[in-house]
Regions:
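NAD(P)+-binding Rossmann beta1-loop-alpha1 motif at the extreme N-terminus of oxidoreductases
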Residues: 2-80
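Internal, conserved structured core segments that host functional sites
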Residues: 62-73, 109, 224-239
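Rossmann-like NAD(P)(H) cofactor-binding subdomain of soluble oxidoreductases
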Residues: 114-180
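Short, aromatic/basic amphipathic alpha-helical patches
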Residues: 60-63, 146-152, 207-212
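Substrate/ligand-engaging "lid" and interaction regions
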Residues: 168-239
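A general structural motif
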Residues: 21, 44, 105, 129-131, ...
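Rossmann-like NAD(P)-binding element
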Residues: 81-137
Length: 239
């Protein structure tokens, strides 16, 4: 079977520049969500970040005042091609409402553990809008669950849904005395990731749209994102 093309080889399928100018919704206030959100903000994008109660206050209660600062994890962030972006990312919105976060957003990043997928998806599905692209990072079969729940809830919105084999970073929320600080330390930045969409016919559009995410810039400028065969293929990738 012929290999799928990498994102760099795909003819322009989605309007990357239009997507890059649109608001981005980040669902999840943990290390992946905070780092992806701050990275996109540092790339000049409008970012809204969301976590659900009862976690919102601890995770994001002060983020509108403090922002999230990205910094190296000693001895330094590993990155093959020298990509570097550090500093304080400022958010346009921090909310405990998924509907508020995703309204009018073109790109939605789901950066939460798979155990929380169902809880977030029940809030997300009624708020989906035609034309949105959902990136589940990492997928962990979240794309399958989201499509299944959309059918069960009668959602027929025309959206692209896919997931990635891993997060674009090794990252941790810094703590002091058991209290989370407004900083995330990066151990490494990925230079390539594999992604796929459900249905598979959307995969090339899905992978191409990653070029519009600031949190994928080290990948876009590295070896590029690659189309996986199916979301099952992506789900097995971290194992």
């Amino acid at each position: 079977m012929a290999a799928r093309p990498s994102a760099k080889e795909v003819i322009e399928l989605v309007d990357v520049e239009e997507l890059r100018r649109a608001p981005i919704a980040i669902l999840g206030g943990g290390a992946v969500g905070k780092t992806c959100g701050a990275d996109c903000a540092l790339a000049g994008q409008e970012v809204r970040i969301c976590d659900l109660d009862p976690f919102f206050d601890n995770a994001l209660g002060t983020v509108m005042r403090t922002g999230i600062t990205l910094q190296d994890k000693a001895p330094g962030t590993q990155t093959k091609y020298g990509f570097r972006r550090m500093g304080k990312g400022e958010f346009a919105m921090a909310t405990n409402s998924v509907a508020e976060a995703v309204k009018g957003a073109k790109l939605i990043v789901v950066g939460i553990p798979s155990i929380a997928h169902e809880i977030f998806f029940r809030e997300l599905i009624p708020a989906l809008e035609d034309g949105q692209i959902v990136h589940i990072i990492p997928d962990n079969y979240g794309s399958l669950k989201l499509r299944k729940m959309m059918r069960e809830m009668g959602c027929t919105k025309k959206v692209i849904i896919g997931g990635w084999s891993s997060a674009p970073y090794g990252t941790r929320v810094d703590t002091e005395g058991g209290v989370a600080k407004p900083t995330c330390s990066l151990v490494y930045r990925a230079i390539t990731l594999r992604g796929a969409a459900l249905p598979a016919k959307d995969t090339e559009d899905f992978v191409e749209s990653s070029k519009a995410l600031g949190c994928f810039d080290a990948i876009t400028e590295g070896d590029g994102a690659v189309c996986g065969d199916t979301v099952m293929d992506i789900g097995f990738s971290p194992m």
